[in-house]
């Protein structure tokens, strides 16, 4: 059609445009008639009136492609992909539809492939994303190989390269640590590598050496298994040693606590010894006082009753001393239990503090990790759609984030429970501390009161003994009895502890002082009486008898007073005994509770210590057993290695030579690596230059496209102008425009070819660089490379498959279109033949009246819509010319856009297929010609 259009430019409008696409069959009931059979319009009458020859006028517009006479069916575009069913086709095309090679009956995955506009939009989006990915890859390669910073717009979207460098640094640190851990087993690995090199040499020397290969593989498998087992055992040993160290630390801390308790017990024992010595001294003093009292009792024959009371008082003193000693022992025990409880509480607090610190540190670490992961996640949101590997990493990071969030929630819940427990325990500890402090203070006060009372009793007893020594005379027995009563009162007042009886004791003391004063007065009177008796024995016997009677009366009165005082003292003693009994019962119950609690805690601690010791013993035994087992394994392996080495000692020299050769080769490879790095630097520079050139070419392409658009517009204008004018000058201008268009097309094609060649060169360089990178990368990324290669193969075969399906669909549609054209052409020829027969038979109409009969008798179905013979006519040129419909123009534009997009997509698909084919070939280390 293009060839015919170039030959006959004026008849271009007569051609109908039928875009390639899927056609839905519809029966056109109102089919258009032949234009020659239509009646003559008013324009023909106007021409007859003007005495001009009549012109044939078409009934319908030639530009109306939808209501074309070429087809009986209406043209429609289907936006969906064709479902290649036989039942959907008409009965006329059954023979065509039967031959469906390389087609699928129902292709529903590529359901949008038949809609050219949607397909082109999707392909454009895919191509833009692929172009963007390729640019990112080129820039990443530049940064990795030459540390070249990108100064363009892609710099914003290359944040993940920094993450790659960080992961590289992390990998290097982890690799260094792993190498340090592997130093212990390097000797065995070197020996096995030597054996492997020997096996390789034997393989190269001997053709059929399958047994050695099998043995080598077995040895390698054994070595790998042993290395894995050794690694796992090392991990187990590390964990066990850590547990042992932790338990030893706990035991050491417990031993330190025990030492502290022992030291505290020693100090308490020393204090007890000092107290016992003081008690012994007091006992000696008491014995001395008792001896003195006995001597006084011997001297005082009349004071038998008072002596028995004094003995009772001494027994009471002994009982109180024994009670004091018991209370002191109880105090010591309570102090010991209090110290033990303190140490235990301190240990528990330390343990809880350590656990809290560990948990807090873990929480801080997790917070830092979460912040890093969130920053990484935010940075990777930008480059999610760029690469499949990044998607997988992002999914993994999402899973890790979900796991970390769940762990954080668990740790937060545990921390809450732990803090609640700590708060409860701290409250319990505070309560127990307060109770313990109150009990200790009460015991201290009680002991201080008892000690003060003892001191008072001792001092009072000493004073009274001195008074008794001074009063050795026989006639002062009654006064000594009074003094003994006062001693009894004072000893009983010692037992009163509380403040209620202090006032009564003070009253008794005042009364005793008054009695003592009375006694002193009576003694003075007795002395005076003695003197008077000595002086007046002879003369004043009667007076003395009277005085003696008066004195006897006074003595009787004093005795009555002493009896009253004794009754008061007895009542006070009863009250004090009751209070003492109550206090004893209270403190004994408290002491029993404390002792029971301390015993329970001791039992618990002993059980824990026993369990820890048993666990330690079991761990030590298991470790010893494991160590012996692995020692035996190591010894067996060493024996096997020694046997293998003894078998192959002869080949060590050759192995050493080959090792030296390999080292030399390694040095050469290092030199080559340095040269390759330099080449990479040059390549990166070339890449940067090529990118700049590509941008320049893009600018030139844009300019060329703009020039082409301008030229096409001018060409269309000139075309319209030439159609109106039809002069030779216009033909000359058209030729010039054609020449200019051809020049522009050649320039455009040359620029396009250069751009495509440079793109292919860049792709090849990219493949080479990826190959070099894959060679330089460690073995840990082999799985990722394998996954990438598999993905490339999947994309390659998918593209091939879709291209085949599309080509088959296009061929099918073209075949249907050509069949329709043939059918329409045959119908047209038949109608023309019938018309010729009718015109040959007609003789009514005379054609001689009309000039230029060749024009009217022409049967060209694609005749021009405009007759240039009427250019110089007086009436308007555009009267009988029909204007183009918007529908036809829109369909033409739509078809052009679709064809352009399909062509671009086809070209990009071919480039993508070639690129993937070369990449797969490079990954497989083979060359496809």
From Swiss-Prot:
Report whether Cytoplasm shows up as a keyword of the record: yes
Ranges of Basic and acidic residues composition bias in the record? 34-54
A Pfam family it matches? Spc110_C
- Give the residues annotated as coiled coil: 117-777
Region of interest: Disordered: 1-66
Residue stretches of biased makeup (Polar residues): 1-13
The alphabetized UniProt keywords are: Coiled coil, Cytoplasm, Cytoskeleton, Nucleus
Relate the assembly described in the record: Homodimer.
Q: What does this protein do?
A: Component of the spindle pole body (SPB) required for the proper execution of spindle pole body (SPB) duplication. Potential role in cross-linking filaments or anchoring other molecules. It is essential for growth.
Q: Which family does it belong to?
A: Belongs to the SPC110 family.
This one is known as Spindle pole body component 110
Q: Which gene encodes it?
A: SPC110
């Amino acid at each position: 059609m293009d060839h015919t259009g170039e030959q006959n430019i004026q008849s271009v409008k007569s051609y109908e445009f039928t875009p390639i696409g899927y056609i839905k069959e519809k029966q056109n009931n109102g089919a258009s008639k032949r234009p020659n059979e239509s009646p003559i319009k008013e324009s023909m009458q106007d021409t007859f009136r003007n005495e001009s020859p009549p012109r044939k006028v078409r009934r319908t517009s030639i530009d109306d492609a939808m209501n074309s006479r070429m087809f009986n069916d209406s043209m429609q575009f289907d936006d969906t992909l064709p479902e290649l069913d036989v039942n959907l086709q008409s009965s006329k095309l059954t023979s065509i539809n039967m031959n469906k090679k390389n087609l699928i009956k129902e292709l529903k995955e590529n359901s949008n492939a038949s809609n050219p506009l949607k397909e082109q939009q999707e392909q454009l989006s895919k191509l833009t994303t692929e172009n963007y990915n390729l640019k990112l890859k080129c820039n990443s390669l530049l940064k990795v190989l030459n540390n070249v910073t990108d100064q363009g717009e892609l710099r914003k979207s290359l944040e993940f390269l920094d993450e790659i460098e960080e992961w590289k640094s992390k990998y290097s640190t982890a690799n260094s640590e792993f190498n340090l851990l592997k130093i212990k087993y390097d000797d065995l690995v070197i020996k096995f590598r030597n054996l492997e090199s020997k096996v390789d040499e034997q393989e190269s020397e001997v053709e059929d050496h399958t047994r050695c290969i099998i043995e080598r593989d077995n040895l390698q498998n054994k070595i790998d298994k042993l290395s894995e087992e050794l690694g796992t055992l090392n991990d187990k040993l590390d964990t066990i040693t850590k547990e042992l160290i932790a338990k030893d630390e706990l035991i050491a801390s417990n031993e330190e606590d025990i030492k502290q308790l022992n030291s505290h017990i020693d100090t308490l024992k020393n204090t007890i010894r000092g107290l016992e010595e003081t008690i012994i001294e007091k006992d000696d003093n008491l014995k001395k006082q008792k001896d003195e009292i006995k001597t006084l009792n011997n001297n005082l024959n009349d004071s038998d009753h008072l002596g028995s009371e004094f003995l009772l008082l001494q027994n009471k003193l002994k009982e109180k001393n024994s009670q004091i000693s018991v209370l002191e022992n109880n105090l010591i025990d309570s102090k010991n239990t209090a110290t033990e409880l303190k140490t235990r509480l301190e240990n528990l607090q330390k343990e809880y503090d350590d656990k809290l610190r560990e948990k807090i540190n873990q929480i801080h670490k997790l917070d830092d990790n979460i912040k890093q992961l969130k920053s990484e996640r935010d940075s990777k949101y930008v480059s999610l759609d760029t690469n499949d590997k990044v998607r997988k990493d992002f999914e993994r990071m999402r899973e890790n984030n979900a796991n970390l969030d769940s762990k954080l929630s668990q740790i937060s819940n545990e921390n809450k429970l732990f803090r609640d427990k700590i708060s409860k325990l701290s409250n319990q500890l505070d309560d127990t501390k307060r109770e313990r402090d109150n009990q200790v203070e009460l015991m201290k006060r009680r002991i201080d009161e008892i000690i003060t009372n003892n001191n008072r009793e001792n001092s009072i007893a000493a004073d009274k003994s001195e008074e008794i020594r001074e009063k050795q005379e026989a006639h002062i027995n009654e006064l000594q009895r009074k003094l003994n009563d006062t001693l009894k009162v004072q000893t009983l007042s010692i037992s009163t502890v509380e403040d209620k009886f202090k006032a009564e004791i003070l009253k008794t003391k005042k009364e005793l002082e008054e009695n003592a004063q009375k006694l002193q007065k009576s003694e003075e009177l007795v002395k005076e009486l003695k003197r008077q008796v000595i002086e007046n024995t002879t003369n004043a016997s009667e007076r003395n008898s009277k005085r003696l009677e008066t004195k006897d009366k006074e003595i009787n009165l004093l005795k009555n007073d002493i009896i009253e005082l004794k009754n008061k003292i007895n009542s006070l003693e009863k009250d004090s005994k009751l209070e003492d009994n109550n206090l004893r019962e209270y403190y004994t119950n408290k002491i029993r509770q404390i002792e029971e609690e301390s015993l329970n805690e001791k039992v618990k601690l002993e059980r824990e210590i026993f369990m820890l010791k048993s666990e330690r013993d079991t761990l030590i035994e298991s470790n010893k057993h494991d160590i012996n087992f692995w020692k035996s394994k190591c010894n067996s392996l060493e024996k096997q290695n020694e046997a293998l080495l003894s078998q192959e000692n002869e080949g060590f020299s050759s192995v050493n030579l080959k090792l030296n050769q390999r080292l030399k080769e390694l040095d050469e490879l290092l030199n080559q690596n340095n040269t390759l790095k330099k080449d990479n630097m040059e390549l990166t520079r070339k890449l940067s230059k090529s990118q700049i050139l590509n941008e320049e070419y893009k600018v030139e392409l844009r300019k060329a496209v703009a020039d082409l658009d301008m030229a096409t517009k001018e060409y269309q204008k000139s075309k319209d102008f030439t159609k109106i004018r039809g002069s030779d000058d216009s033909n000359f201008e058209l030729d010039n425009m054609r020449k200019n268009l051809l020049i522009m097309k050649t320039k455009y094609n040359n620029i396009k070819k250069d751009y495509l060649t440079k793109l292919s060169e860049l792709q090849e360089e990219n493949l080479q660089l990826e190959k070099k990178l894959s060679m330089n990368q460690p073995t840990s990324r082999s799985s990722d490379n394998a996954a990438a290669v598999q993905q490339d193969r999947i994309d390659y075969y998918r593209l091939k498959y879709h291209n085949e399906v599309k080509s088959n669909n296009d061929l099918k549609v073209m075949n249907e279109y050509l069949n329709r054209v043939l059918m329409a052409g045959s119908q047209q020829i038949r109608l023309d033949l019938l018309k010729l027969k009718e015109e040959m038979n007609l003789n009514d109409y005379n054609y001689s009246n009309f000039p230029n009969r060749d024009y009217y008798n022409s049967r060209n179905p694609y005749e021009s819509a405009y007759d240039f013979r009427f250019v110089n006519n007086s009436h308007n040129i555009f009267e009988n010319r029909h204007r183009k419909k918007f529908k036809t123009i829109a369909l033409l534009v739509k078809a052009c856009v679709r064809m352009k997009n399909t062509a671009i997509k086809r070209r990009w698909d071919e480039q993508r297929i070639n690129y993937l084919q070369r990449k797969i070939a490079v990954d497989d280390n083979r060359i496809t010609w």
